[in-house]
Amino acid sequence: MKFELDTTDGRARRGRLVFDRGVVETPAFMPVGTYGTVKGMTPEEVEATGAQIILGNTFHLWLRPGQEVMKLHGDLHDFMQWKGPILTDSGGFQVFSLGDIRKITEKGVHFRNPINGDPIFLDPEKSMEIQYDLGSDIVMIFDECTPYPADWDYAKRSMEMSLRWAQRSRDRFDSLENKNALFGIIQGSVYEDLRDISVKGLVEIGFDGYAVGGLAVGEPKEDMHRILEHVCPQIPEDKPRYLMGVGKPEDLVEGVRRGIDMFDCVMPTRNARNGHLFVTDGVVKIRNAKHKSDTSTLDAECDCYTCRHYSRAYLYHLDRCNEILGARLNTIHNLRYYQRLMAGLRKAIEEGKLESFVTDFYQRQGRDVPPLNVD
């Protein structure tokens, strides 16, 4: 992987990630394909929304179908027939979200398989091996996603262990002679001094890109913005910056304003299946009875398949009848909305008009622009 930085506007960056499997224009949003599928979508449909890279889930793909089935096909690209780059998370977040059925040690994490209850062990070395078999274009280190809230002492211990696991991830990745990219993950909860230690330690180890982890886990938005404003300038300028698990459209806008290049989140797909649709002036809750006879399109400014062909009344009807097509059409729209938003942000940065774009984005939703505390 090669990262090219073209231009900046304030702290916002316009560039691209270059892989053997294709080019990803940044800032970029990555749809989530947890089980080797972006729910309800074929790879061609996902590509048609404008997505150039997707995310796969190491933990779930390890449990089902497993490494052996994956290797029979070649890798995850061959298994799911996605031709572009794939980023896989390390499995850490899923393991730590298991709560009481897992035990963290210095060596790794003991837990019970949520499918059948069998005892399983996952550590940095195993995570690197699974992601190698998946053929991930971007591999994420195995870390502990520090929960929120966490006091300073716990956050410090967690961050320090994640740094030790980062070195172990790096060592196993290198011993596998993996030619793809490896990203470090910055931890430290909402504490700036801990984030400083994490960034410094990861940069000393050396990675192809750096993710900001442990945000969007329940902390106030002001804390997320503050940490991004503090951390992003410390990440080497020639490396991509990835904000994990984020988020709402406004979170993408605010991340870009603070220097983030990459995002992923289940929100556009999950919300689509629940009838929660993102449009230029906010959100349409398609289950609301007011849409029963509405012949207008979902979003007059959207060029997606759904908006070009169907009315709000039809989408309301499909949802009321629990038709699978409704979830699919909603997903197509939400994914396209996110990609159109990213394309708009990229164009605004190119033209040096980002703050004008941001102001318009919020004004059209009747909201104020959040403060930006950067030099």
UniProtKB/Swiss-Prot annotation:
GO terms for molecular function: metal ion binding; tRNA-guanosine(34) queuine transglycosylase activity. Residues 245-251, 269-273 are annotated as: RNA binding. Binds 1 zinc ion per subunit. GO terms for cellular component: cytosol. Pathway: tRNA modification; tRNA-queuosine biosynthesis. It is an enzyme of class 2 (transferase). Its EC number is 2.4.2.29. Substrate binds at D89, S90, G91, G92, F93, D143, Q187, G214. The active site is at D89 (proton acceptor), D264 (nucleophile). This is Queuine tRNA-ribosyltransferase.
